[in-house]
Amino acid sequence: MSLYFEEFVLDRLLETRGRTITESDVVSFAGLSGDFIELHTNDEYAKTTPFGQRIAHGALIFSVSIGLMTQMNLVTETVLAFYGVDKMRFTKPVFIGDTVRVAKRVIETREMGHSRGLITFDSKVLNQHGETVLAYQDKLLVKRRPSET
C-alpha cells in the first residue's frame, strides 16, 4: 500500500534490503550506457589503479538505489514525479561482489497546493560493511491524502 505525503514525517527512516552487485550488472550497464571506461571493463587496467580491481559505475549504484526503494512499494500509487537530486557524492568504490542497501531519512516536507507535497530525503547507499558508498539528497513529489467529503 502506497504512502501519502502526510505519512512522511520528519526523521522517518526507510531502509531497503540488500542487493549484490554482479559482473553481469557492470557489463550490462556498460552496454546500456555506453560507458566502457576501462576502470569498469578492463581487469588488467584496473589492477594498475589505486582500487586494484574493477569498480562498478557510480551511475549504476545510483540506479540500483532507486530500484531498491521502488521495490518497497512505498509510493508506487502516490508518486507524481522524481523531482531531483542534490549533493550527490560517491564516497567509496563499489566492487563486483559487494552488497549494497539504502537508508533514507525524511529531512524536509513541503506542501505544494491541495493535492501534492514535496518530500526531501537524505539518502545513503551502504555496503556490506555499513560504509557509505554514495550519499545524496533526493526529492519526490507525492500525492496528498484525498480529503473526505
For each feature predicted by the language model, list its residue ranges.
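Catalytic strand-loop segment that frames the active site of acyl-thioester-processing enzymes
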Residues: 1-56, 143-144
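HotDog/MaoC-like acyl-thioester-processing domains
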Residues: 1-9, 90, 94-149
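Short, intrinsically disordered, mixed-charge
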Residues: 31-35, 67-74, 128
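Short, intrinsically disordered/low-complexity patches at protein termini
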Residues: 38-40, 51, 80, 85-87, ...
